[in-house]
């Protein structure tokens, strides 16, 4: 299945998934395409963060749906 991920800049990234894939796998694919480490990624659907440990099925992700990618930046002084 194909799921779309939209960044804060408005860029839309399509990722191909299997129902048994973990949500974390989406972050790995985004790292390959965009160079953003998974530890800095948060995937949001309907205003809630999706747990990395869930499978695509358990997270209720379906073909064509759109997730939002939010980056968490490490704070400094």
UniProtKB/Swiss-Prot annotation:
Pro-peptide region(s): 77
SMART domains, sorted: UBQ
UniProt keyword list: Isopeptide bond, Ubl conjugation pathway
Signal peptide range in chain numbering: none
Position(s), cross-link Glycyl lysine isopeptide (Gly-Lys) (interchain with K-? in acceptor proteins): 76
GO BP of this protein: modification-dependent protein catabolic process; protein neddylation; regulation of proteolysis
Pfam families given in the database record: ubiquitin
One GO cellular component term: cytoplasm
Residues of the Ubiquitin-like domain: 1-74
Keyword ATP-binding: no
GO molecular function, one term: protein tag activity
Ribonucleoprotein among keywords: no
InterPro entries for this protein: Nedd8-like, Ubiquitin-like_dom, Ubiquitin-like_domsf, Ubiquitin_CS, Ubiquitin_dom, Ubiquitin_ubiquitin-like
Other noteworthy facts: Present with 1310 molecules/cell in log phase SD medium.
Function: Ubiquitin-like protein modifier that can be covalently attached to lysine residues of target proteins. Activated by the dimeric UBA3-ULA1 E1 enzyme and conjugated by the E2 UBC12 to substrate proteins. RUB1-conjugated (neddylated) substrate proteins include the cullins CDC53, RTT101 and CUL3, and the modification enhances the ubiquitin-ligase activity of the corresponding cullin-RING-based E3 ubiquitin-protein ligase complexes (CRLs).
Subunit structure: Interacts with CDC53 and DCN1.
Protein name in the entry: NEDD8-like protein RUB1
Originating organism: Saccharomyces cerevisiae (strain ATCC 204508 / S288c)
């Amino acid at each position: 299945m194909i799921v779309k991920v939209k960044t804060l800049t408005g860029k839309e990234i399509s990722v191909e998934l299997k129902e048994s894939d973990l949500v974390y796998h989406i972050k790995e694919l985004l790292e390959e395409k965009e160079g953003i480490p998974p530890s800095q990624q948060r995937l949001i659907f309907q205003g809630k963060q999706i747990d990395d440990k869930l499978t695509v099925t358990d997270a209720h992700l379906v073909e064509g749906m759109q997730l939002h990618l939010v980056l968490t930046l490490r704070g400094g002084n």
